[in-house]
């Protein structure tokens, strides 16, 4: 999903395509169903809706809740709150949602008031700047290889 979004795909379309792919894979049914549940859920952000997707205790449930939060939230903060304020494994679902949101709109994340209090914010900001540079200038790859060696 994230690779498709990084390539310019819409989150909802990327998720639907991923669900279709997983539905065809041996053992992929649970993941496909979890993604489809997030896509079908009403975009009301209600706790009951989040809980209908599970508790986030399995990878499939955590992905479903994080995806739902990103689709249901009208802002970075609202989406992250949806992912973080349920009775399940909310630290995991919020972390996954935060990564999705950062990919969807890195500028909104970096200028949000919470960005200043995140541990490692300076490192995260540098990674975002480098990613954005690479996304807009393929020639930056050689320069960034010096910073991030290993291929």
Residue ranges and their predicted role:
Residues 12, 17-33, 123-151:
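Contiguous hydrophobic segments
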Residues 36-51, 55, 108-115, 139-151:
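Long, charge-rich low-complexity segments
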Residues 1-73, 79-86, 100:
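Amphipathic alpha-helical interface segments
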Residues 61-147:
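Catalytic phosphate/nucleotide-handling subdomain of diverse soluble enzymes
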